[in-house]
Design a protein with these regions (language model features):
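A short, charged
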Residues: 34-59
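Aromatic/acidic, Gly/Pro-rich catalytic loop(s) in extracytoplasmic/lumenal soluble domains
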Residues: 1-35
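Active-site-proximal, structured, solvent-exposed surfaces of multi-pass membrane proteins
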Residues: 13, 50-288
Length: 288
């Protein structure tokens, strides 16, 4: 059977936590996915607010890497050509200490190799005319029976085993997804390699492939600040959620419930507007 690991988060945010500054949603939407997760620990994302705008500190870093291909895998012109099932390629790099590592791919596509493309030029030259003609015959009709529908890439490393699922527009569950982010985990001493295992033969093309390190040294302090003035005595009963909170200055209280127009909020008995915060949650303005 499979082996699973369960991890306890030491930095879980409370159910209701507060920000003293905000990030305009228009600005947030233009950030990269790595920048967004950093931003959410520093300011609340709102369409507009009377709070001061957050001065962001971003410290992610893209690191250069080298691709080392194994047997049955070849790198050529921004593509990885795989002629053997479960062929591997290693990404070798110098990761940052005390960082999370992310493998980010954009514009990923997959195409099945034809029978001729599966044979190396060296092997082809040693084949008889009869054998070559058999391959040509298979080559003329292979597209009618083997469409490029789906492929899987396993991403592995120390304490890491994840799979990227690629679906093409020929697959009945195709969703248009061609960009992927794989969290390769935290490394105290700087991770230095990731291994890609290609379950399927074929051509794996991509517009961009990068390794990004995200130092986490500031996370403890940022999470602590968000939870310093948080919602207390939280109760849920009779379709109602209540709690108590005091703030030292004007803040936005974010409640970890999906945003919905069906809710009504009251602060100190007065009806208060509910704002959509951090793209998915609800927020209330709190005055000092």
């Amino acid at each position: 059977g499979k082996t699973y690991r369960a991890y306890e988060c030491d930095n879980a945010l409370p159910f209701g936590y507060t920000y003293d500054s905000y990030i305009p949603r228009e600005k947030y939407e233009k950030m990269s996915v790595i920048e967004k997760q950093q931003a959410l620990l520093q300011g609340v994302v709102l369409d507009e607010s009377s709070l001061p705008e957050t001065v962001l500190t971003l410290n992610d870093r893209e690191v250069p890497f080298k691709i080392i291909t194994g047997k049955g895998c070849q790198e050529k012109d921004g593509k990885l050509i795989v002629t053997k099932e479960n062929a591997q390629a290693r990404l070798v790099f110098d990761g940052l200490d005390e960082s999370e590592i992310y493998l980010i791919t954009e514009g990923v596509n997959y195409e099945v190799l034809s029978p001729r493309a599966m044979i190396s030029d060296k092997k082809w030259k040693n084949m008889s005319i009869y054998e070559q003609n058999q391959v040509f015959h298979e080559n003329s009709r292979w597209r009618y029976w083997k469409e490029s529908q789906k492929a899987y890439i396993d991403v592995t490393g120390k304490f890491l085993n994840k799979t990227i699922s690629i679906y093409t527009d020929k697959y009945n569950a195709y969703s248009g997804k061609h960009n992927f982010l794989c969290n390769a985990g935290y490394s105290r001493m700087g991770k230095n390699s990731l291994t890609l295992t290609f379950q399927n033969t074929g051509v794996y093309s991509y517009d961009d492939l990068k390794v990004v390190c995200q130092p986490v040294t500031k996370v403890d302090k940022q999470v602590k600040k968000l939870g310093e003035e948080s919602l207390q005595d939280v109760k849920v009963e009779d379709h109602e959620l209540t709690g108590k909170i005091s703030v030292s200055k004007p803040k936005a209280l974010v409640i970890a419930l999906p945003y919905s127009t069906g809710f009504t909020a009251y602060v100190d008995g007065k009806k208060t507007d509910i704002k959509q915060a951090n793209t998915m949650y609800m927020a209330l303005n709190l005055a000092h």
